[in-house]
Each structure stands twice: as structure tokens, then as C-alpha cells.
Amino acid sequence: MIALIQRVTMARVQVAGRTQGEIGAGLLALIGVEQLDGPAQAQRLLERMLDYRVFPDDAGRMNRSLRDTAGGLLLVPQFPLVADTASGNRPGFSRAAAPAPARALFEQLLGAAQAAHAPVAAGIFGAHMELTLTNDGPVTFWLAVPPAATAPEA
């Protein structure tokens, strides 16, 4: 499971011209779900997003986390994050989870985030979304929690 996190002073996601979610200072996280991802990957990714130290302390060093700052978290599903771009001129999406399990895992991640932190907002899985954001820094990181090594046995 992948999160591309960006430190922002504000971020908003709109669907069909209507604001779906909005935060002030905090993290915008674009989320990609891979085929073998499950609840363990979602939970670990959430912990990393909440505890990753990307906010400045009093000395200006990145020593504070989202939990420390009580900043907002905007989760936006984005399946192209798991694209294979190693060759050719067109991305391949064979690593991406199918829509139904990806949606379920994104919703699980969102629910866990809302239970663990506030404020949390989100985009809509499968919708065409428009994002407005102001990067702070800019500070952008790629967080990845590898999928399970093998598919669960039947």
C-alpha cells in the first residue's frame, strides 16, 4: 500500500464542483492499493502517516508528526500510484488491486484514520476529483508498506 504524502497549509478535494473534503495545515495523502494489500498494510500505513516527522520543531528541524501538530489529514484514493512505469510509454496497472477490494481497503483506512485522529477528510473512491492545495516547503514523501508476500491460502 502506498501513500504519497505532501505537507500542506491547506488542501481541498472536489467532486462535480462540490467540496467533498477540506483541511487546513496538515498532510494530503494520495493512496494507492496493491493486489495483495490487506488490513495489516492499511494499519501500518496509517501509523506511518500519523507518526512520520515532517513538521518543523522550534529549531526548524523536521521533528514533529501529524499527531504532534494535530494537523488535518486528507486521504485521496489514487490507483495510478501503483502503476508500473519501468518500460514503455504507457503505465501498466497490473499491480493495482481490483476496484472492489481496493475500495474496501481504502474505506477501512479512512475509518481507522477517523478513529485515531481528527480532523480527517477524504475524496471519493472511483470519482473524478479535483484537488486544490498549497504545498508547504514543498515537503513530499513516498511511504510504502509492501503487500503480503503471498496470497492468503484458501
Placement of each model-derived feature along the sequence:
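N-terminal, polar/charged subdomain of small-to-medium soluble alpha/beta proteins
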Residues: 1-88, 92, 104-154
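Short, conserved glycine- and acidic-residue-centered signature motifs
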Residues: 98, 102
